[in-house]
Structures are given as structure tokens and as C-alpha cells.
Amino acid sequence: MTGADDMTMPLPGGLDAGRTAALADLVAQIAGAAPLQSLPYLAPALLFANASVQDRLDMPHAAADQILVQEYQGITCLCAVIPGADLVATASAQHKASGAAYRFALADRDGNGIAQLDTALRLFPADDLAAVKPMRLRPDMLGDADWSDEISVPQSAIDTYLALSGDGNPIHSDARQAAALGLAAPVVPGLFLISMIQPICEAALPGTALASLKARFLAPLCADQAFRIALQQRGRAAGTDHHKLRAYAIGSDDRVLAIADLQVQS
């Protein structure tokens, strides 16, 4: 995918049931939470591990003084994704000097819409990554937000996630590269980081399922570094049964690593 033209890809077997179950177990384990009540919020992103998708992604090439980072992830769920069911993906890409944006619209064999994924990647100056300092948010600034317990992600869990997701970016696995960039350890993948929103969301609003998620990634979190998830409930979306929420991933220094706006439905 090198331009804005759509490309249709049949995905026999769709979302792999084994990978989906393994991701659910991994998220609950790292979050120190009960088993997930529903399909992992980020399960549709596991389709990036599909060989047919990998062959067509045409990822941006980072120069020697650049690193490829994820800026944004959006997911819109139109109906439940059933692991193992055949899917068709209509994909498009927009490439520019600073990175790339991808859109995947997922449908069943009959053409019924199931989900849409939007991803934005950016080529970032490698020497600047360790110096990124996003805003601080102290707990008292978030009012009556629900807070997770402290979470840290060991490299072994990152490696498991990389195997499930097909993410081959060395920033997540290469300790030497991380050290050369001034980082304490490889970086936790952004999608894995925001997966930790689901356990606290299900605890606050049991029996709900994801309708949409829009996440922005602001700073790297290294393996074994502590963070917490803060979840704010923001009422109902007009004309729907959707609950609006905002989630923050916040490091031990109170700096915001990622922000996600969600809607969940009963």
C-alpha cells in the first residue's frame, strides 16, 4: 500500500482464537486483574500479525538518525468480532515524509461492517526520544477518577506480546538500541500499554463492551518502569447507550504517557 487507493484482502480464519485468548490472559496477568469479561479491546489489532497484512503494510523506512514510533490508534467496533470467523479487510495508506497513516475496515464474508482500525506512525528524531517530557497530572488533578494499582511490564511480557502481534520494531526488544537512545530499557508497545485500560474499565462498568477508542501516545514507557491507569467517567454520549470515558496512562513521575478517549456500550 503506497498510496491512498483502497486494497481488499480476504482474511480466512480472521482473528486467531489462540492469539486472542493469549492476549486476554497476558493483559489480565500484567494488570494484576481478574480475567477479562469480553474480547480484548485491542484484539482487532492482532490482525497486523496476519502474513497477508504484513506483506502489504509498506512500513515507513527509518533513516539512521530516526526511530519509528506510534502516534495514534483508533478502533471503532460496529459489532462483535468472532475469533476464527472469516473476515475481509479493506485497507488504505497515506505516506508522507514524516510517517504514515493506515486505515483498515473489517467486514464479514457478507460485507457487513465489523470494525475499523486507524493507525498513525511517525518518524521521530532518535536523539530526541529520551528527552520527551509530556505534561504532568497529579492524582489530585483528576478528581474522582478510578485508579489501577501500580503496573510494570517486564521484558518477558513484551516479548510475548511481540510474538502475538507480529510487531517487529526493534525499539521494543533491542536493549542495545534502547541504551544508545538514552533509554533505560526497550519500550513497551503503545497498544500493549493501552490494553491495560480494559481491566479497570470493566471493573468500573461491568457488562460493557468497547464501542470506540481513540488513543494518543505522548512518551515512551520502558520495560519494568511503573505506571498507573486513571479512568474518568464522562457521562453518556448523546442519543446512545454509550458511556464516555477518558483514560490516562501515567508514569511514576506523574507524566502522561498516553491518553485514550473511549465509549463503551451496555
Predicted regions located by residue number:
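Long, charged, glycine-rich C-terminal linkers/tails
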Residues: 211-215
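HotDog/MaoC-like acyl-thioester-processing domains
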Residues: 2-8, 72-150, 220-266
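Hot-dog-fold acyl-thioester-processing enzymes
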Residues: 2-70, 129-207
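Short, surface-exposed, charged/polar-biased interaction segments
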Residues: 179-182, 218, 222
